Amino acid sequence: MPNSIWTSSDARAIHARMKKGDHLFLVDGSGFIFRAFHALPPLTRKTDGLPIGAVSGFCNMLWKLLRDARNTDVGVTPTHLAVIFDYSAKTFRKDLYDAYKANRSAPPEELIPQFGLIREATRAFNLPCIETEGFEADDIIATYARQAEATGADVTIVSSDKDLMQLVSPNVHMYDSMKDKQIGIPDVIEKWGVPPEKMIDLQAMTGDSVDNVPGIPGIGPKTAAQLLEEYGDLDTLLERATEIKQVKRRETILANIDMARLSRDLVRLRTDVPLDLDLDALVLEPQNGPKLIGFLKTMEFTTLTRRVAEACDCDASAIEPAIVRIEWGETARGPDLDAAEPEPVAGGIPEVSGESVPMPPRAKAKSAVEGAFSPADLAKARAEAFATLPFDHSAYVTIRDLVTLDRWIADARATGLVAFDTETTSLDAMQAELVGFSLAIADNTADPTGTKIRAAYVPLVHKNGVGDLLGGGLADNQIPMRDALPRLKALLEDESVLKVAQNLKYDYLLLKRYGIETRSFDDTMLISYVLDAGTGAHGMDPLSEKFLGHTPIPYKDVAGSGKANVTFDLVDIDRATHYAAEDADVTLRLWLVLKPRLAAAGLTSVYERLERPLLPVLARMEARGITVDRQILSRLSGELAQGAARLEDEIYVLAGERFNIGSPKQLGDILFGKMGLSGGSKTKTGQWSTSAQVLEDLAAAGFELPRKIVDWRQVTKLKSTYTDALPGYVHPETKRVHTSYSLASTTTGRLSSSEPNLQNIPVRTAEGRKIRTAFISTPGHKLISADYSQIELRVLAHVAEIPQLTKAFEDGVDIHAMTASEMFGVPVEGMPGEVRRRAKAINFGIIYGISAFGLANQLSIERSEAGDYIKKYFERFPGIRDYMESRKAMARDKGYVETIFGRRINYPEIRSSNPSVRAFNERAAINAPIQGSAADVIRRAMIKIEPALVEVGLADRVRMLLQVHDELIFEVEDQDVEKAMPVIVSVMENATMPALEMRVPLRVDARAATNWDEAH
């Protein structure tokens, strides 16, 4: 927590009115109390045995929230904050229903004195401590939330209590601090099957065994959601209950109409609670360090006292413990204090499947059982159902008028879920033109696995196939773009509707150019990638074949191929409907099958923290692009051409004849036929292999011609791939190069780039560095390159817990020199460069499971000597071998390995009977957690960068442009370089927090210059 938020005064100032842009945190204090109490072992104050376990947990949770709010899933620092408590169990609801909470037990005796202490703790944090007699904390939270929402401010309710989910809206979210998960409209829908505005009706039907809300016996959340889907709301259901076909359900509902309405009154939160403090009094004031330290010292919280003292730069030893009043017996006040041991309820209240228990007594600490369909059951049932469910293309609808489009959009809003896809004129999202879009909506039946899907296509600018001289040529009966886009925009930007797409980044970037920013979304490609990285492709066609048993219509079947290929705007609308609507249909089915698997596999956090939030970040980066200097590229192209020509002449002299150097056959005949070099092998076609590895091995053996061939290949590749090709990638309008990033192409989580590929420009060769000089900033700007230093070795030190490496990184020691000193007994001071180079090769080689043969080639030494190096390395750092063996064992046992953030990298062939295949998988399983963890770290950094820049007012003046392995490139206005650089470095170095604290520090080197090479 920065020192600037600390003060020695706790006076609350007069502040301006709450407004749009402010962010109010409402902490469910009672929920915090019970979570803290049940999560920690009993703790007493040493001096007198006073129970303080819940107080300790509460203070640490509140400290963490205040200190790290921006680094949580919420991603912002609050401008206003209040902690809300229950005054007592006697509320207006007891007047409505005397049995309300009658089954609640009195809290444990050791918790009773801690209620008052926790209120004192809240005041010590200089935070408003709010409670109102006759009302529950939830009612106070509801009142403040709705008031703040009316001002345009955003609200975060710090609680996971389902009773508060009825408040969730586009401006009101919840936050589960234990799971570091923000809860929005899609999350409510996913968990309960209804949007937040229907939660009151759902709870009224299901009742609540914890609060003794009667509900309708036998109706659980799944059934309630289905009934609400069918009838719309509780009143309509009760009015039309006689229409229900299931006899027992109909009779039960008819017999409990009054109880259902009473239950609705009990679960509906009040938003008109009389409040002593208005919104403006909830502004987050600076913390009073000495006051808080005084309270913490009284509680004997040594560790937290030290942390607070460090944060506020206070001398804790000079601060006296505070005098804190302790509430005992009749003076104590808190939830359920006036409750007795529960009496059996006549007839009982049926357990509600899926019920959550926000504030349980210790005897009821366990959550209620899950519903009949666990995520694993649901995933299995849906997979079985959709594997045989046919596709009916004749049922697809072509939407040609606004009335029909409005009806479909209304249905999507009512359902809260829609799959969509765009049809365009190009695969390049930066140049494609929107032609039409498709929608798919699920109509849920009583069986959650038997989902009927409707799909439609909305053509916008299809042409007749032949344009006229006056510029017309549009096919008849299409909705004008100007009328359709506002409706599409309203739907895609509606956070209450979950949008599902396949490879959404393309659609996101395309639609951004049309002024539409897709919000609240899922991407089936990314879900598949999280679940099954390393086991197959994640495109729509292979996923459809794998999970739905269906091969989608090939694009060439509707648009032709080769010379007959046409852009999609020239495709007949009926044929386009079959193709486009099927895409949306397939996507929605895939989502229904794949999404439950995330929860079943425990991979939801990987998807929600590392994949989904990165998608819009990458789309914005791609849209920005980067400037290249064509003159520099032209000059370099000429230099490379001259270099290639010189190498060709030298090659011809060494070969004794002219030949086609680019022909593998002719080259093989020269090397292994004419010259008779040893070490050659033939491919399956009978030709000599002239792969890069073969040539490098020959060059390492001292043969000059193969070395020249390697050099020639590098030079000609740089010329053809970069200096000649890059100018062709310059966008005609932006005049910048826009690469495209793939989130789901590698097995380890690393991003890849294409069109053009900017991640393979050599950085260690002079020619590669020259190419980087062509990537420049625009006038008045600089490029900042921020690069992680030796991140994979740091990850290795963390996961393998290698003391020598950990200490070296902590002390800022040259890690390669340290390794050389450890292995070869050479002092770091005055160490020859060759010795350090060998240690560096070993350090990085070990990460990739290098063999003695590979290391020998890399260092140009005998294989026996390389083997000795590797043996000695493992002797000096024994934990590394242990780590490697543990990863191989995990891969063999589970079929996958994991990164430090839980990403799974699958190795289905790890048990192959083929020794070569098995060995390859084992080597990959060693490196993958390290490389994947490094990739996860930079993903987290990229996600956190933009909010951090917003917080310091640099959002519009610092633009993240590129990601190249462990490096991020930014374009920054000249006057903001000094302010931006420390923010970027800080976010990157702390990217793992608060989810994970590394055992070794991450280090980022950042520089600014007018071109990429000088900045790197």
From Swiss-Prot:
Subunit-structure text: Single-chain monomer with multiple functions.
Region (Polymerase): 768-1016
Highest classification ranks of the organism: Bacteria, Pseudomonadati, Pseudomonadota, Alphaproteobacteria, Hyphomicrobiales
Keyword Cell inner membrane: no
Molecular function in Gene Ontology: 3'-5' exonuclease activity; 5'-3' exonuclease activity; DNA binding; DNA-directed DNA polymerase activity
Transmembrane domains' residue ranges: none
GO biological process entries: DNA-templated DNA replication; double-strand break repair
Chemical reaction(s) catalysed: DNA(n) + a 2'-deoxyribonucleoside 5'-triphosphate = DNA(n+1) + diphosphate
Organism of this sequence: Rhizobium leguminosarum
Domain (5'-3' exonuclease) ranges: 1-308
Role this protein plays: In addition to polymerase activity, this DNA polymerase exhibits 3'-5' and 5'-3' exonuclease activity.
Protein keywords: DNA damage, DNA repair, DNA replication, DNA-binding, DNA-directed DNA polymerase, Exonuclease, Hydrolase, Nuclease, Nucleotidyltransferase, Transferase
Domain 3'-5' exonuclease stretches: 394-630
Protein name listed in UniProt: DNA polymerase I
Record-linked InterPro entries: 3'-5'_exonuclease_dom, 5-3_exonucl_a-hlix_arch_N, 5-3_exonuclease, 5-3_exonuclease_C_sf, DNA-dir_DNA_pol_A_CS, DNA-dir_DNA_pol_A_palm_dom, DNA/RNA_pol_sf, DNA_polI_H3TH
EC code(s) of this entry: 2.7.7.7
Region described as Disordered: spans on this chain: 334-361
Family: Belongs to the DNA polymerase type-A family.
